[in-house]
Design a protein with these regions (language model features):
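Helix-to-loop junctions at the C-terminal end of transmembrane segments
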Residues: 77-89, 291-304, 392-393
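Conserved MFS/SLC helix-loop-helix module at the cytosolic interface between two early adjacent transmembrane helices
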Residues: 76-114
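C-terminal transmembrane helical hairpin of 12-TM major facilitator-type secondary transporters
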Residues: 303-355
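Flexible cytoplasmic inter-helical loops of multi-pass small-molecule transporters
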Residues: 5-6, 212-232, 429-435
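Extracytoplasmic gate region of multi-pass secondary transporters
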Residues: 45-49, 168, 240-292, 384-385
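Glycine-rich segments within core transmembrane alpha-helices of 12-TM secondary carriers
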Residues: 150-176, 374-385
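C-terminal membrane-cytosol helix-exit motif in multi-pass small-molecule transporters
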Residues: 176, 198-221, 418-423
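Cytoplasmic membrane-interface "Motif A"-like loop-to-helix N-cap segments
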Residues: 87-98, 300-313
Length: 436
């Protein structure tokens, strides 16, 4: 009479597994929504840089100072952000981050002075770096199975890109309607854009705080808390060579992404109107879900690190194309290159956190590891805006951007070498473990 038991257990196991999968994907979708809503307001320059310079009456260099300061705050926040992610409930950190970022955006919409802009960007660095960053990445790593790391991180970056693209499309429509249909000033149009992003952040934050963490995540956090020892765990992480190679890859890959922030100004310098350049850069944003999710899927199907290497090589060559193609006078080729770079950089962003799984880092200190990688990997936030501002002010027009994109391409070569080295180490470890 006991024979039917296994069949019953099988029927019980399948719904449980499906329920677990649905729960994990639902959690991922919430994180995608939060990540997609919070960052665009900080980086409106990638679509509206020329407009921002006019509205706030600042120079390229002053805009560079603002983003350099933002990057410095990020740099100082990443390590404690990892510590917070290991110690405090993520949903409260995310709620605070979204609401604070949105509230600062409302101040931003009033077109404050340079001093006010410095305060806003500094506080944005805390609200999106200290309390938000590592908690989101750690939660994704926790809810993804080992075989799903590329897919989940790809969905995170690609999905947030989809959210960003949707918001950017609506924002550009508002801006075009205000400035072209209603003949309002650029300042009025820009204010509508900022309002959109600010209120969306606040609304999503209020929704997310009402949702409780799954019991499994709460239990994991409790176990981690009892085992946490900062100095011991730092020493453990420092001794992992693969972690430093991942750090180098993130550092170089982030250079590629930073270059895309200047595409709007670059295209306007090539003769496009603000709306046309904004349209092209918005199309580029739509490459994020394709590049992020597609890159993650290919990474899980083949190899995260191998797909990443291919993407790094292609985007490096495309950066060289931005230097060469303008001389050919083919605007269509230039636009295609800009969109292709967007596709590849988003694939890179979707993959370089997935390869962290190859470092065999204990889950209880994953947040700390993310903090360490972020401190060095996102160091470009502190100096690339200064380099870009200096070169475009010192050498106006195509010459300045040729120098800038040439530097980015050189760093892309270094990133490719780091990725090749990491793949060699991973393959060597696998070979040794098989006992061959």
């Amino acid at each position: 009479m006991s024979k039917p038991a296994p069949a019953v257990q099988g029927f019980d196991a399948a719904p449980a597994a499906n329920s677990d999968k649905a729960s994990r994907y639902f959690q991922l979708m919430l994180l995608v929504l939060a990540a997609g809503a919070i960052y665009p307001i900080l980086y409106l320059r990638q679509v509206y840089q020329t407009t921002m310079l006019e509205v706030f009456q600042i120079s390229h260099s002053e805009l560079g100072y603002l983003y350099s300061m933002l990057g410095t705050i990020f740099l100082l926040s990443y390590l404690p952000s990892g510590w917070l992610a290991d110690r405090l409930p993520p949903r409260f950190l995310i709620f605070f981050s979204l609401v604070a970022t949105g509230a600062l955006g409302l101040w931003y919409s009033t077109v404050p002075s340079m001093t006010g802009l410095m305060i806003i960007f500094g506080c944005w660095g805390l609200s999106t770096g200290l309390t938000f960053w590592a908690s989101v990445l750690k939660r994704v790593k926790m809810i993804a199975h080992h075989s799903e790391q590329g897919r989940f991180f790809g969905i995170l970056d690609g999905g947030r890109g989809l959210v960003e693209a949707l918001l950017a499309t609506v924002a550009l429509g508002l801006f075009a309607y205000a400035t072209e249909t209603r003949s309002q000033t650029a300042a009025e149009g820009f204010k509508h854009v900022v309002y959109l992003y600010s209120f969306v952040c606040i609304a999503i934050g209020c929704v997310l705080v009402l949702l409780k963490d799954p019991k499994s995540m709460a239990q994991t956090a409790a176990v981690e808390k009892g085992k946490f020892n900062l100095l011991t765990d730092l020493a453990t992480l420092v001794k992992i060579p693969e972690l430093w190679l991942v750090t180098a890859i993130v550092f170089c890959g982030y250079h590629m992404f930073w270059a895309t922030y200047s595409f709007s100004d670059y295209l306007q310098g090539s003769g496009m109107t603000a709306v046309m350049a904004g349209t092209i850069t918005t199309i580029k944003l739509w490459m994020r879900p394709i590049g992020g999710i597609g890159g993650g899927w290919l990474g899980d199907k083949f190899s995260n690190i191998s797909v990443l290497i291919v993407a790094l090589i292609l985007v490096t060559l495309a950066m060289v194309g931005l230097i060469v193609f303008p001389a050919a006078g083919n605007l269509g080729l230039l636009i295609g290159t800009v969109i292709f770079i967007g596709l590849m950089t988003y694939a890179i962003r979707g993959l370089y956190w997935a390869i962290l799984d190859s470092c065999n880092i204990p889950l209880r200190i994953t947040g700390l590891a993310i903090g360490i990688v972020s401190v060095v990997g996102y160091l470009p936030d502190t100096f690339i805006p200064l380099i870009n501002g200096y070169l475009t002010d010192k050498y106006p027009g195509q010459v300045g951007y040729n120098l800038y994109f040439g530097y980015i391409a050189f760093v892309g070569v270094l990133g490719t070498l780091a990725a090749l080295t990491l793949r060699a180490r991973i393959n060597r470890k696998k070979f040794n473990q098989t006992g061959a």
